Amino acid sequence: MARYTGPATRVSRRLRVDLVGGDMAFERRPYPPGQAGRNRIKESEYLLQLQEKQKAKYTYGVLERQFRRYYVEANRQPGKTGDNLVVLLETRLDNVVYRAGLARTRRQARQLVSHGHFTVNGKKTNVPSYRVSQYDIIDIRERSRKMEWFEEAQDRLGEAVVPAWLQVVPESLRILVHQLPERAQIDVPLQEQLIVELYSK
């Protein structure tokens, strides 16, 4: 299955949640597309679980096979499977770049990582799904620092609310991973227990 590259607002409306952040088009019409969009259909338990999974997949830009692998790994780890799942998604490299304010959207962050603009602990890393660890140091590659995009990112650095588990060094745009996040620190509108129930069937 190919990755969805169409209008994010359409998906946000279908799932009734802003997947982009600050999506004015969604705020104007926060109901599913189509003439009957305003009339909510009766939602079964399965549909609610499926919608929650779709919400997580579209939020983090993950396809079904990879998402299932995340679930399997989360289920193996100690603690709550749902919490573990969200932490695994949140610690993807592309998401960390987005959370640090170096990209306006996760989709944009994924592109920047894929194009090889970052190093992790001094090594070039172009895999968006790379999982960061505590004490990792993420830098913009030397040849990429003069790009107009990163210069603009530096100018607007104060606009982003960087989560407490990360730190951005303003002069170099270096990202420091002080710790792995806890579920309470992750502000995504997910009911992950519904996803756990879906995969547990």
Swiss-Prot record:
Pfam families the UniProt entry points to:
Ribosomal_S4, S4
Q: Which InterPro entries match?
A: Ribosomal_uS4, Ribosomal_uS4_bac-type, Ribosomal_uS4_CS, Ribosomal_uS4_N, S4_RNA-bd, S4_RNA-bd_sf
A GO MF label: rRNA binding
Keyword terms of this UniProt record: Ribonucleoprotein, Ribosomal protein, RNA-binding, rRNA-binding
Q: Where is the S4 RNA-binding domain?
A: 91-154
Q: Ribosomal protein among the record's keywords? A: yes
- May I have one GO cellular component term? small ribosomal subunit
Its biological purpose: One of the primary rRNA binding proteins, it binds directly to 16S rRNA where it nucleates assembly of the body of the 30S subunit.
Protein's recorded name: Small ribosomal subunit protein uS4
Q: Which organism is it from?
A: Corynebacterium ammoniagenes
Which gene is annotated as encoding this protein in its UniProt record? rpsD
